[in-house]
Curated annotation (Swiss-Prot):
Its EC number is 7.1.1.-. Pfam families: Fer4_7 (PF12838). This is NAD(P)H-quinone oxidoreductase subunit I, chloroplastic. It comes from Chara vulgaris. Its cofactor is [4Fe-4S] cluster. The gene is ndhI. Belongs to the complex I 23 kDa subunit family. NDH is composed of at least 16 different subunits, 5 of which are encoded in the nucleus. GO terms for cellular component: chloroplast thylakoid membrane. Residues 55-84, 95-124 form the 4Fe-4S ferredoxin-type domain. GO terms for biological process: photosynthesis, light reaction. Transmembrane segments: none annotated. It is an enzyme of class 7 (translocase).
């Protein structure tokens, strides 16, 4: 008889505890109903990037002095710099400069240590392509100014 009463007592205590936990979860859910949505509808809304955002690297061909500091400070030796030494003026002449963004870790060391500021980080983060070889940008692609998506009339800013 006492065994039945103890089991009934334990059952009622566990039922009350379960109902209390369900009630607590329901209260948390009700508290979040009035909050605004965090999700951004990506193609139609874009996030405003911060001032120090590290996006695609912009390269200015005319400012580069071919010092190769960017290659030395890169943790993965990523920038490929091709140059010729011109005997008549005794200077290096830049032939080709390329960065593979499929491998780049966007650390920003190349931008930080460049003595002539020919490298800069842009706010462009949409680098998705179907073929990974298209992420190898040469000096022409790196010199292209980034497209500001907020100038598009169909895109709204997400705050």
């Amino acid at each position: 008889m006492f065994n039945f009463i103890n089991s009934l007592k334990n059952y009622s205590q566990e039922s009350f505890r379960a109902a209390r936990y369900i009630g607590q979860g329901f209260i948390v859910t009700l508290n979040h109903i009035n909050r605004s949505a965090i999700t951004v509808q990506y193609p139609y809304e874009k996030l405003i990037t911060s001032e120090r955002f590290r996006g695609r690297i912009h390269f200015e061909f005319d400012k580069c002095i071919v010092c190769e500091v960017c290659v030395r400070v890169c943790p993965i030796n990523l920038p490929v710099v091709d140059w010729n030494f011109q005997q008549d003026i005794r200077k290096k002449k830049l032939k080709n400069y390329s960065i593979d963004f499929g491998v780049c870790i966007f650390c920003g060391n190349c931008v930080e240590y460049c003595p002539t500021n020919c490298l800069s980080m842009t706010e462009e983060y949409e680098l998705s392509v179907y073929d990974r070889h298209e992420l190898n940008y040469d000096q022409i692609a790196l010199g292209r100014l980034p497209f500001n998506s907020f100038q598009d009339a169909l895109v709204t800013k997400a705050s």
